A protein has these predicted regions:
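Iron-sulfur-cluster electron-transfer modules
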Residues: 1-113, 248-258
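Short, flexible loop segments at boundaries between secondary-structure elements
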Residues: 113-137, 171-179, 227-258
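Short cysteine/histidine-rich zinc-coordinating motifs and their immediately flanking basic loops
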Residues: 77-79, 192-195, 228
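Basic- and aromatic-lined ligand-binding clefts that recognize polyanionic substrates
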Residues: 27-32, 36-38, 42-45, 133-169
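A short, acidic, amphipathic alpha-helical segment used as a generic capping/interface helix at domain edges
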Residues: 86, 191-211, 215
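Local cysteine-cluster metal-coordination motifs and their immediate loop/turn environment
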Residues: 33-38, 62-75, 98-107, 142-153, ...
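Alpha-helix C-terminal capping segments
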Residues: 50-54, 89-91, 107-112, 127, ...
Length: 258
């Protein structure tokens, strides 16, 4: 792992597992965006929660990190952070987690104590034409590699994009044949050179003249680093984010109840 990556992710994980950043609404169900997606405008995430509420009345919010970066970058700290997260979820009475992030979905399933539901099939059943506020238009789709075997989520995302009036050009490799963005298991920090090779290979599958849409904000961040235009599925549903970053994450965090 390079030094700058180590310092940056070390600070990220320390902040993510600090008390002010770990907020979970009291109740049986929460919407869990994940670290990267909390960088979008909070209004987009609130619209997402409202649509999920049609399936899960009273659903709350979680601003927590799943801890996957610590698993691969700081294994000595991972177990303690996982226990801290488990105690908070137990204290707040959480039983069901509606996860937006593919990596969070996998990590939270590993806890073994909660029903973890990807949000995409739920949204596909409960978002209507009247909810759409995105720009529509042509795009190409990147299926995140953690979702490679999840045909239900893949098809749900495509139904949502059709509803949002997106003219989709499929990647050369998609669905179960998708390729990694170069950051699986924190590869960008652990081996930047290998990560870049993987990312360039994946970008070769995606038509150069089209914006890349995905349901993983971490993947999109990697592609933006290579100069590609990107947009998250939630932005195509509920409006484009005017900014990205920790300011938005903090604003979202304040909506949760400690």
């Amino acid at each position: 792992m390079n030094k700058s990556g180590s310092l940056g992710m070390g600070l990220h994980q320390a902040l993510s597992f600090s008390k002010p950043m770990m907020r979970v609404s009291r109740g049986e169900a929460v919407f869990w965006p994940g670290c990267a997606l909390m960088g979008l405008d909070p209004a987009i995430l609130e619209r997402t929660r409202q649509c999920l509420e049609r399936a899960e009345p009273g659903i709350g919010l979680s601003s927590c990190c799943c801890g996957q970066p610590s698993r691969y970058l700081f294994p000595g700290a991972h177990q303690a952070r996982q226990e801290k997260l488990r105690r908070l979820l137990e204290k707040q009475g959480v039983k069901r987690i509606y996860a937006a992030c593919p990596n969070c979905t996998q990590e939270l399933e590993g806890l073994g104590e909660y029903q973890v539901l990807p949000i995409w099939p739920v949204l596909a059943e409960h978002v209507g034409p009247e909810d759409i506020q995105g720009p529509g238009g042509p795009a190409t789709l990147h299926d995140p590699c953690p979702m490679r075997k999840d045909a239900i989520c893949q098809q749900a995302v495509r139904r949502l994009l059709a509803l949002a009036d997106v003219t989709l050009t499929e990647a050369a490799r998609c669905g179960e044949n998708t390729r990694c963005c170069g950051n699986f298991h924190m590869m960008r920090a652990l081996d930047p050179d290998k990560s870049r090779v993987m990312r360039q290979a994946r970008l070769g599958d995606l038509p150069a003249g089209l914006p890349i849409v995905s349901y993983c904000e971490g993947c999109l961040d990697a592609f933006r680093g290579e100069g590609r235009r990107t947009i998250h599925v939630l932005e195509l549903l509920f409006g484009q984010s005017q900014s990205r970053g920790w300011g938005n994450r903090w604003a979202f965090t304040r909506k949760g109840k400690a």
